[in-house]
Amino acid sequence: MYLNGRITRIFRLKKNSFRQQNFLYPLLLQEYIYSLAHYNSFNSLISYEPVEIIGYDNKSSLVLVKRLITRMYQQKSLISSLNDSNQNEFWGHKNSFSSHFSSQMVSEGFGVILEIPFLSRLVSSLEEKRIPKYQNLRSIHSIFPFLEDKLSHLNYVSDLLIPHPIHLEILVQILQCWIKDVPSLHLLRLFFHEYHNLNSLITSKKAIDVFSKRKKRFFWFLHNSYVYECEYLFLFLRKQSSYLRSISSGVFLERTQFYGKIEYLIIRCCNSFQKILWVLKDTFIHYVRYQGKAILASERTLILMNGWKFHLVNFWQSYFHFWVQPYRIHINQLPNYSFSFLGYFSSVRKNPLVVRNQMLENSFLINTLNNKLDTIVPAISLIGSLSKAQFCTVLGHLISKPIWTDLSDSAIRDRFCRICRNLCRYHTGSSKKQVLDRIKYILRLSCARTLARKHKSTVRTFMRRLGSGFLKEFFLEEEQSPSLIFLQKISFILHGLHRERIWYLDIIRINDLVDHS
């Protein structure tokens, strides 16, 4: 901890010296950058597999960083790395240190460096506007109470997929308005060409492997930068089409080249731009997004929703200069449609409600319908995620986890229990709990099979020896875990009992096994 605090203080001092001119390339040759990147990457890691910690000297040598950048700029080394990956000494997999260092530490360090101009503007913006720092505002579950309050009164919903693939040069141009450092941009282009599959890594719904052990800081930075550009077009139209002040857009950073692009578009369609804004004027529209998928909902008519779709597609095509497939935006009526978002199938259901009306001495009953947001867990998708992680088959049949048999019994139980608690805790907002009981059963028996395989015994014999209290922590109530929660009673009747929908407001990262979309 002392070493990390010292590195952080040095990093802040260096960052202030480079903040004015945004000249970031010399930071690549600073040794503490890679130590800081390694420390942050390790601490933010949520993994179910054992993590191999490599020493500081093996990953943060300044001489190796210089040699690495020099080799990257050598044309022969670049060509050989692209043509013959088996004989490549730099990017190849035969040299474990080179592959780990080049693909992990340099990209992580480069991501830390690229965040400097963004972080300085964000901190100054928050200080000027005096925005309070509430940790629960970062919760993923905080989206669902918002949807419960808003979607029940709306008519149409649009499923949006962020446009992809995108040309690599467009990513460089996106960052060019923030970073004026030409050597850093050249090095960024070189990184893009080395990661030849970057298109599928940063924008598609399979952006990062669901069960990957490490999520690259560098790729998250590129993903967020690109999504920011896509959303800024929407926020610009939303702000121009409504005279109401948008609170959500207050935290966005100031742009330098975006308005020049908009002026160019206004000149091209100056006669029809005001008509477009008049068509898009809608003060009752709501927008939420997670990763590459977004939800756009409104209480207006289908014509207005088609107008939003048409103009968003055209603005994306004009701004990014590539074809945006219109089929990526689906418009549906909320009462007749279920959409997948953040690991749930959500839909608006008609809930019958009987109200007793009292007028003087007479009373009578009124039957009415009330809209309720119904969120359920997709059993097939969740079991498919468990099968990819090799906890069961695609059909839900139990299997053991042979790669964990070298661990101790307590370590195996802790891993299974942690996965089970995380999944059940995240899905406590479901109106149907039968799927969660099935997930508990699969993980409990998979743990028993793994332990029985380790001790070379049968599952029945092993569980009989341990007794009925085996793995009772699998069935602990989710309400016992200490956290900030949001309770809401729902009218769904399951097995004759009223169930509570629970949203946890301290979940700031979606679990790997939850992100099965």
Swiss-Prot record:
For this UniProt record, give its keywords in alphabetical order, as a comma-separated list.
Chloroplast, mRNA processing, Plastid, RNA-binding, tRNA processing
Q: Kindly report the protein's main subcellular placement as a broad class.
A: plastid
Q: Which GO terms describe its molecular function?
A: RNA binding
Q: Which GO terms describe its biological process?
A: mRNA processing; RNA splicing; tRNA processing
Highest rank taxon of the organism:
Eukaryota
Keyword Plastid set for record: yes
Query: Which Pfam families did the record assign?
Result: Intron_maturas2 (PF01348), MatK_N (PF01824)
Intracellular or extracellular location(s):
Plastid, Chloroplast
- tRNA processing found in the keyword field: yes
CC annotations in GO: chloroplast
Cystine crosslinks: none
Q: Which family does it belong to?
A: Belongs to the intron maturase 2 family. MatK subfamily.
Which function does this protein serve? Usually encoded in the trnK tRNA gene intron. Probably assists in splicing its own and other chloroplast group II introns.
The identity of this protein, by name, is: Maturase K
Which organism's genome codes for this protein? Dracula chimaera
Its gene? matK
